[in-house]
Amino acid sequence: MAREDSVKCLRCLLYALNLLFWLMSISVLAVSAWMRDYLNNVLTLTAETRVEEAVILTYFPVVHPVMIAVCCFLIIVGMLGYCGTVKRNLLLLAWYFGTLLVIFCVELACGVWTYEQEVMVPVQWSDMVTLKARMTNYGLPRYRWLTHAWNYFQREFKCCGVVYFTDWLEMTEMDWPPDSCCVREFPGCSKQAHQEDLSDLYQEGCGKKMYSFLRGTKQLQVLRFLGISIGVTQILAMILTITLLWALYYDRREPGTDQMLSLKNDTSQHLSCHSVELLKPSLSRIFEHTSMANSFNTHFEMEEL
């Protein structure tokens, strides 16, 4: 009974961990999609510069192939573990354990790689000034994607221009910066701020923000946190799976207490029936002798009369 209760407890815990795998996988997919859109805008602004190379080397090998592959595999593996737990199938549980171990090793290698990449970003502050060349095509019908990227980046990082908001006046034919440079954005806000109060515009340039973005570790820390969370959950799942495999394996080799009791009762009943069968001839002989004695006594009494 104690082993059966332990198996039930292990199965419930594995159900919960598989549900957690599905939720975390969906979260990783959402974060990867957000990071992809975010980085695509950065790549649009940094095309044909050394900054583009830095972005690709730092983030894309992790975000696209590894994170997406891990979350897709975890969804499938979670289903495999759920089926194995429900059916108590040793083969499915063994596959579940082996797949989790392989994914964990991949995540561990990915984490080590991101720590090494932190000091390998090939970008300097002087490279950020080259982004000014990407400002000349802002607002042109042929470069709507570039216009969208600049607006997205300035809103997201709360910056304006590359070094200062006056970069827009120097590099383009615009009389004032885009409206995305406004602290409180609305149509025509940049023109109003340029004519009345410049403090309504973001004063810091986007070059410094992007440099901090590339040299910093905020985004990599998010990826590491997700990787560590999934890794810890995988370790717990592997421990529970091994324990459940051990319990199910020995439960099949050794009969349970109820089976032993039923076997003992069946053996006792069989022995009782066998004993009765053995005693039947003796009882029949005793009955015959008793009948003969009674008939002899009756005959003797009749002769005396």
Swiss-Prot record:
GO CC annotation = plasma membrane
Phenotype upon knockout? Mice are viable and fertile but display defects in retinal vascularization. In retinas between P5 and P12, the centrifugal outgrowth of the nerve fiber layer (NFL) vasculature is moderately delayed in retinas. At P11, vertical sprouts and plexiform layer (OPL) capillaries appear in wild-type mice, whereas both are completely absent in mutant mice. In adult mutant mice, the plexiform layer (OPL) remains avascular, confirming that the defect is not transient.
A matching Pfam family: Tetraspanin
Question: Which residue stretches are annotated as topological domain Extracellular?
Answer: 34-59, 111-224
Q: Where is the lipid attached (S-palmitoyl cysteine)?
A: C9, C12, C83
Task: Briefly state the modifications made to the protein after translation.
Answer: Palmitoylated; required for interaction with ADAM10.
Q: Which family does it belong to?
A: Belongs to the tetraspanin (TM4SF) family.
Q: What does this protein do?
A: Regulator of cell surface receptor signal transduction. Acts as a regulator of membrane proteinases such as ADAM10 and MMP14/MT1-MMP. Activates ADAM10-dependent cleavage activity of amyloid precursor protein (APP). Activates MMP14/MT1-MMP-dependent cleavage activity. Plays a central role in retinal vascularization by regulating norrin (NDP) signal transduction. Acts in concert with norrin (NDP) to promote FZD4 multimerization and subsequent activation of FZD4, leading to promote accumulation of beta-catenin (CTNNB1) and stimulate LEF/TCF-mediated transcriptional programs.
Q: What is this protein called?
A: Tetraspanin-12
Whose protein is this, by species? Mus musculus
The taxonomy runs:
Eukaryota, Metazoa, Chordata, Craniata, Vertebrata
**Which gene is transcribed and translated to give this protein?**
Tspan12
